[in-house]
């Protein structure tokens, strides 16, 4: 993947955010109100959200450990690519969160958005979503089989939905998070090819 495509993705994400500011509280808050119920059974959606960080940690560790035990250098190297995508994703997500500093929807609309819990960091982009899509995309790049790709992206998409259902994020936070995660995985793949080409 060319670096030009990565810059283009970043510009699209920024454009989405600033376009959203221009249209402010219209379609986005209406959609979020439809997704986020005032009285809900949060358990399933909460568990989906909570699955992100344990899976993100366990996946590359398991890949590396199995690769080490089986003396499988390829699998070990694939675990590095996953870690790379997660590190890039975390860096970009946090940089965007603190530079844009978007208010959480439940702070801006306390009478119409009902959060499961209140997060302390900024809203844009969704960190859970970006991390889920970084992992899903990285795994899909490594294992291009439908039985890997479909469950990975289904899980990542359900994480994004859960963040809105729980009242934690606007739809554009989730879309931007998905874009950042996908871009991070492809950037990690590209960097690995450049750094480790024989």
Could you say what each language-model-derived stretch is?
Residues 4, 41, 69-77, 81, ...:
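Juxtamembrane/transmembrane-helix boundary motifs in multi-pass membrane proteins
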Residues 55-65, 88, 92, 151-158, ...:
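Lipid-exposed faces of alpha-helical membrane segments in multi-pass integral membrane proteins
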């Amino acid at each position: 993947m060319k670096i030009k495509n990565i810059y283009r993705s970043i510009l699209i994400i920024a454009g989405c955010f600033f376009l959203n500011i221009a249209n402010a509280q219209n379609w986005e808050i209406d959609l979020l109100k439809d997704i986020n119920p005032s009285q809900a059974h949060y358990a399933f959606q909460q568990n989906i959200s909570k699955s992100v960080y344990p899976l993100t940690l366990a996946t590359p560790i398991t890949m590396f450990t199995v690769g080490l035990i089986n003396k499988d250098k390829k699998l070990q190297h694939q675990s590095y690519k996953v870690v790379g995508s997660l590190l890039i994703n975390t860096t970009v997500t946090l940089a965007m969160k603190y530079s844009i500093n978007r208010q959480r929807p439940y702070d801006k609309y306390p009478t119409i958005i009902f959060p499961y819990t209140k997060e302390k960091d900024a809203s844009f982009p969704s960190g859970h979503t970006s991390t889920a899509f970084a992992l899903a995309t990285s795994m899909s790049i490594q294992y291009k089989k439908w039985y890997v790709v479909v469950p990975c992206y289904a899980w990542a998409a359900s994480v994004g939905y859960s963040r809105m259902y729980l009242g934690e994020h606007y739809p554009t936070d989730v879309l931007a998070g998905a874009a950042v995660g996908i871009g991070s995985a492809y950037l990690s793949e590209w960097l690995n090819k450049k750094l480790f080409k024989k």
